């Protein structure tokens, strides 16, 4: 059974771990990939060993993101999922199920989150998981670099599906 945790606990857990695997959902969209990559970059900035794993190939439209794809070069001591409301959303490929059944922490914005992780931070009022990370990353002591900002912007922009007029006006 999952335990709902606050932001301070999330920051504490992430700072206490060294070898961190970040899981994204199958058929990855801008929020799961943008959030996962932003968190990975922030953790690496803090000296952590971190990488991202997704069951499905990452679409070419996200090639501009500096994604560190998990290659098995370290043994994850802590597993965090971003933007994944239920265990069935992980998919089957890339041995992801090996890690999906042992998620330490889930950071999500879906009120329908099934509570599969040991600890969960869900803010159903957030537009995207990326929105949560815009404040969690500085709370961890990491700087929001242009690369991290781009990933977070992608997560917020593509998940909320703005109209062409919204993009033009901004």
Regions found by a protein language model. Name each.
Residues 1-17:
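Positively charged, low-complexity intrinsically disordered leader regions
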Residues 11, 37-40, 59, 130-135, ...:
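Predominant activation on well-ordered alpha-helical scaffold segments within soluble catalytic domains
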Residues 21-74:
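Anionic-ligand anchoring segments at beta-strand to alpha-helix junctions in alpha/beta enzyme folds, i.e.
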Residues 25-26, 55-56, 82-85, 107-110, ...:
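Fold-independent oxyanion-binding glycine-rich loops
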Residues 29, 39, 80, 133, ...:
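Divalent metal-coordination and catalytic microenvironments
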Residues 63-119:
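Active-site cofactor/cluster-binding pocket
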Residues 110-161:
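Short alpha-helices
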Residues 162-170:
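Single conserved hydrophobic/aromatic residue that forms the stacking wall/gate
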């Amino acid at each position: 059974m999952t335990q709902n945790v606050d932001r301070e606990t999330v920051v504490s857990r992430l700072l206490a771990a060294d070898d961190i695997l970040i899981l994204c959902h199958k058929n990855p969209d801008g929020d799961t990939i943008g959030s996962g990559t932003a968190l990975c970059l922030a953790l690496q900035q803090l000296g952590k060993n971190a990488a991202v794993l997704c069951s499905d190939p990452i679409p070419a439209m996200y090639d501009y993101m500096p994604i560190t794809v998990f290659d098995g070069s370290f043994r994850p001591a802590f597993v965090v999922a971003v933007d994944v409301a239920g265990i069935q959303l992980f998919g089957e490929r890339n041995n992801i199920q090996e890690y999906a059944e042992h998620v330490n922490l889930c950071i999500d914005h879906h009120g329908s989150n099934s509570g599969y992780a040991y600890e969960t931070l869900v803010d159903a009022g957030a537009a995207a998981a990326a929105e949560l990370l815009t404040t969690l990353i500085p709370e961890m002591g990491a700087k929001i670099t242009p690369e991290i900002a781009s990933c977070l912007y992608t997560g917020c922009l593509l998940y909320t599906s703005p109209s062409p007029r919204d993009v033009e006006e901004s």
